[in-house]
């Protein structure tokens, strides 16, 4: 029997105590607070952090009464940053706030100072965004990304529920999957390598770390069928990771954009999501592109798909929409593109209405800021709802 031609592909994730992810979560917690009181809020909120300090800065125009310092401390505390030992002390760290209003030049160009109807609202900036979907997992997401993300989420779960009391908030995961290319569709065969680097306290040995990670983190997350005697495990390979969080590394909003999306699969236009209200097409454009790509795969039009959309500042209609099914389409890509443009309204104001993106509160955007924006079962993730698409398979 001929040997199957395979390749290796790797995706990484970081969990909620990673300094960059801490910043994403603070930025989105600020966005939630603004939208909860004033759905028309215009938010571009950046966060940076280093030892004993968090700074929130950017442009925010809102009628909401927002206590930025409280949001910073609450978010840090919720993640588990409760002492300098673990990397940051939520109660006593310095919190700096430097927030200004949105530029009036941008405001008049995008929403005419709130005089425009939703379908007339222009894109908040230029740029291009991508959505991706693949039939290799029930979530219609790449397996390498799904496993890396779930390992990170599980690390946090066993830290917070006490199963692995030696864990500290910061941590990273990485999964290498061996794939077969089936005429453009991706078929995962096995997990080749699992890498976990997690912050830990002084009391635990490296052997205990490895044993606990295998038992409490890897076993519950990675399906048995993907693990074999050849699977390689790198568990805290550096040997020591006691200092972590903002004490170990500086953090910044928007530095984990591949972890937020598809783990290196598909493509990325470069625009981050967190801290941005939905008039920013970096966020809303990527969300509608995911819904379009996911709907194409879920409706059986293709096994794998990427959608690109692009915008000019102040212009409602997208400049371009592109669809590529990597040769897996049941009908030609140009037909699928026609179905997409007939079924999805890519104008920013209409994306906001159709995906209900102005609804804040309930930690809606905070939830997106760790463990990925896509492939998650949660009614707040409205862009994950599959749209039924009418199409006919060509007769043979």
From Swiss-Prot:
EC class of the enzyme, as a word: transferase
Gene Ontology MF annotations: ATP binding; metal ion binding; methionine adenosyltransferase activity
GO terms for biological process, alphabetical: one-carbon metabolic process; S-adenosylmethionine biosynthetic process
Binding-site residues, Mg(2+): 12
Binding-site residues, K(+): 46
PROSITE patterns to which the protein is assigned, alphabetical: ADOMET_SYNTHASE_1, ADOMET_SYNTHASE_2
Pathway as given in its UniProt record: Amino-acid biosynthesis; S-adenosyl-L-methionine biosynthesis; S-adenosyl-L-methionine from L-methionine: step 1/1
EC id: 2.5.1.6
Keywords: ATP-binding, Cobalt, Cytoplasm, Magnesium, Metal-binding, Nucleotide-binding, One-carbon metabolism, Potassium, Transferase
Cofactors named for this entry: Mn(2+); Mg(2+); Co(2+); K(+)
Details of cofactor binding: Binds 2 divalent ions per subunit. The metal ions interact primarily with the substrate. Can utilize magnesium, manganese or cobalt (in vitro). Binds 1 potassium ion per subunit. The potassium ion interacts primarily with the substrate.
Localisation per UniProt entry: Cytoplasm
Purpose of the protein: Catalyzes the formation of S-adenosylmethionine from methionine and ATP. The reaction comprises two steps that are both catalyzed by the same enzyme: formation of S-adenosylmethionine (AdoMet) and triphosphate, and subsequent hydrolysis of the triphosphate.
Subunit details: Homotetramer.
Protein name, UniProt field: S-adenosylmethionine synthase 3
Species per Swiss-Prot/TrEMBL record: Oryza sativa subsp. japonica
